[in-house]
Curated annotation (Swiss-Prot):
This is Large ribosomal subunit protein uL14. Part of the 50S ribosomal subunit. Forms a cluster with proteins L3 and L19. In the 70S ribosome, L14 and L19 interact and together make contacts with the 16S rRNA in bridges B5 and B8. The keyword RNA-binding applies. PROSITE patterns: RIBOSOMAL_L14. GO terms for molecular function: large ribosomal subunit rRNA binding; structural constituent of ribosome. Pfam families: Ribosomal_L14. GO terms for cellular component: cytosolic large ribosomal subunit. The lineage of its organism: Bacteria, Bacillati, Mycoplasmatota, Mollicutes, Acholeplasmatales. InterPro entries: Ribosomal_uL14, Ribosomal_uL14_bac-type, Ribosomal_uL14_CS, Ribosomal_uL14_sf. GO terms for biological process: translation. Binds to 23S rRNA. Forms part of two intersubunit bridges in the 70S ribosome. CDD domains: Ribosomal_uL14 (cd00337). The gene is rplN.
Length: 122
């Protein structure tokens, strides 16, 4: 569960390393974001050769959370970090590679490109 001012690692090669959540999208009173939700973020740390720079405001989809997510069969999946993938307006990732595992719930929310680029889907 992520909210405003939460810091996330970036799990792609778009150039950003760390981002800060400035808004959870999906409703006027929506407070928390979980896996598969879209958030507006600002880049706090970036590599000098990347396509996004420090201070850029972009959209991202949450791919891993420490809080985890509960599945229909009763199992819970949790990750070691909070991570997001920066996306373009057409909901495709801005980078060309995804680092680390992602949750299966992204497939249900139609982020097929992220699922196909990920090295492992849990």
């Amino acid at each position: 569960m992520l909210q405003q001012e939460s810091r996330l690692l970036v799990a792609d090669n778009s150039g950003a390393r760390e981002v800060l959540v400035i808004r959870v999208l999906g409703g006027t009173r929506r407070r928390y974001a979980n896996i598969g939700d879209i958030v507006t973020v600002t880049v706090k740390k970036a590599s000098p050769t990347g396509t996004v720079k420090k201070g850029d405001v972009v959209k991202a989809v949450v791919v891993r959370t420490k809080h985890g997510i509960r599945r229909a069969d009763g199992s819970t999946i949790k990750f070691d970090d909070n991570a997001a993938v920066i996306i373009k307006d057409d909901m495709n990732p801005r980078g060309t590679r995804i680092f680390g595992p992602v949750a299966r719930e992204l497939r249900e929310k139609n982020f097929m490109k992220i699922v196909s680029l990920a090295p492992e889907v849990l």
